[in-house]
Amino acid sequence: MKKNNFGFTLIELLAVVLMIGILTSVALPQYRRSVQRAEAMEALVNLKTIFDSAKRYRAANSDTPGSLKGLDVQFFDADPNSSDPIIGNFRYAIKPTHIGACRVDGKAHSTYTDTYCLVMMYKETINGTTYRDLLKCNTGSEKWKYVCESLAQSCTNGNTAKSGTTYYISDKVVCD
């Protein structure tokens, strides 16, 4: 009488588990980077929204806003009276010369360790040329360098528009 054995051997199961582990180890870092780039894009959209609203505020009041209060935008998770509200994973700074968004380590601590910042300048002079509404990304951390590089403008010569640790996102910056 012939005996039929159905099922998998231990070796076959171990091989499948090993393959799943290898695929996960390759895919997980890419997934994490995609999530971080998406967070940066969300901050970029929020930053541009606040910046445009601040420009309208300046035009109407001949002054720069000191907080979100008085602007024609609202963020449900932000304190409108704060000059540096936290929205999502970013702390926004509303200053007379610029509006910035720095990635913070968490709402509880809100520290600026090992991070990057997106900055919208009302006006900045670079190499004798004055630019208005200049958008840039600053990082001193190798860990976050790829975020700034992925957001930065590409020059016609294939280089990234940057100066030191500052990456220019605005298409107004002339590439070297």
Predicted regions span which residues?
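Phenylalanine-focused residue identity feature
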Residues: 6-8, 51, 75-76, 90
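N-terminal single-pass transmembrane signal-anchor helix
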Residues: 2-30, 34-35, 43-46
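Short, contiguous, well-ordered secondary-structure segments
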Residues: 1-3, 18, 40, 44, ...
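Periplasmic/extracellular, small/polar-rich flexible segments of pilin-like filament-forming proteins
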Residues: 60-176
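Conserved hydrophobic/amphipathic alpha-helical signal-anchor segments
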Residues: 25, 33-73
